[in-house]
Amino acid sequence: MMSRTPDARARDTQTKQIQENITSVEKHFGDLCQLFAAYVRKTARLRDKADLLVKEINVYADTETPNLKCGLKNFADQLAKVQDYRQAEVERLEVKVIEPLKAYGNIVKTKREDLKQTQSARNREAKQMQQLERMRQRNPSDRQIISQAESELQRATMDATRTTRQLEETIDDFEKQKIRDIKKVLGEFVTVEMAFHAKALEIYTTAYQHIQNVDEEGDLEVFRNSLHPPDYQSRLEIVRANSKLSLNRTGTSMSKSGTMQSRTSSRQRKRDDEEDEEEDDEDEDDLEEVTDDEH
């Protein structure tokens, strides 16, 4: 059997290398596509969780004192804005990163078809070469059959050469496009992420300021007042006033009692004096009567 020519062996090596290259791109671009898709799904889930966080902060804010409530509401508004930009991040990554990588599934499929056509042409060439060799061995003197086989081999060789050249061109274009695409995809990824994080940093800064500007002393005053409502203060003042009035009345009563006792004592002393005077007058009258009797 006629051995394959050096040119055929070189083409076989070339075909194997092209096939390995296509397989490598198919595998790694497929893996990148899956991982970027998972990244985007995680980002979308983070957005959903943040939306729940915004909702809970708003619910909590409604139970708080005025200044803290305002700070929490403003904080939640800023956090919600971040999620709007996160949603835009998700959508841009899907369009600018995932879709181009996903497209390589069809691109690789097309290149495999091109490789298959080239391989078929080379197989036909190899088959014609083997057929010619058999004819030369079986009918070395039959120039017509040998000439016909040589013509068929020549056409097969030309076809194999043409498809090989086309494959080289298309694979060259594929390689250039692959490099450009992966550069663009990763560049777009970084650009989208930088745009999101730059805006998120700006919004988070505002959110931080809102929560730090909460008037703690003002809210503490409100809280303390809530422990002692106005009606409680009024009742406390009434109790204090009543207590003071009671003390005043007690003092007045004691003062009046002392005065009355003093007056009673004075009147008693006056009555006693009057009685003494009457007794003295009676003694004087008795003395005068005795004197008159003696005369």
Swiss-Prot record:
Its main location: cytoplasm. GO terms for biological process: cilium assembly; inner mitochondrial membrane organization; positive regulation of smoothened signaling pathway; spermatogenesis. The keyword Isomerase does not apply. Keywords: Cell projection, Cilium, Cilium biogenesis/degradation, Coiled coil, Cytoplasm, Cytoskeleton, Differentiation, Flagellum, Membrane, Mitochondrion, Mitochondrion inner membrane, Nucleus, Spermatogenesis, Transit peptide. Residues 12-222 are annotated as: BAR-like. The keyword Phosphoprotein does not apply. It holds the Pfam family FAM92. Residues 243-265 have a biased composition (Polar residues). It is a peripheral membrane protein. Residues 273-295 have a biased composition (Acidic residues). Residues 243-295 are annotated as: Disordered. Residues 1-49 form a transit peptide. InterPro entries: AH/BAR_dom_sf (IPR027267), BAR_CBAR1/2 (IPR035590), CBAR/FAM92 (IPR009602). It is found in: Cytoplasm; Cytoplasm, Cytoskeleton, Microtubule organizing center, Centrosome, Centriole; Cell projection, Cilium; Nucleus. GO terms for cellular component: centriole; ciliary basal body; ciliary base; ciliary transition zone; cilium; cytoplasm; mitochondrial inner membrane; nucleus. Residues 111-185 form a coiled coil. Belongs to the CIBAR family. Plays a critical role in regulating mitochondrial ultrastructure and function by maintaining the integrity of mitochondrial morphology, particularly the organization of cristae. Plays a crucial role in ciliogenesis. Plays a key role in the correct positioning of the annulus, a septin-based ring structure in the sperm flagellum, serving both as a physical barrier and a membrane diffusion barrier that separates the midpiece (MP) from the principal piece (PP). The BAR-like domain displays limited similarity to other BAR domains. This is CBY1-interacting BAR domain-containing protein 1.
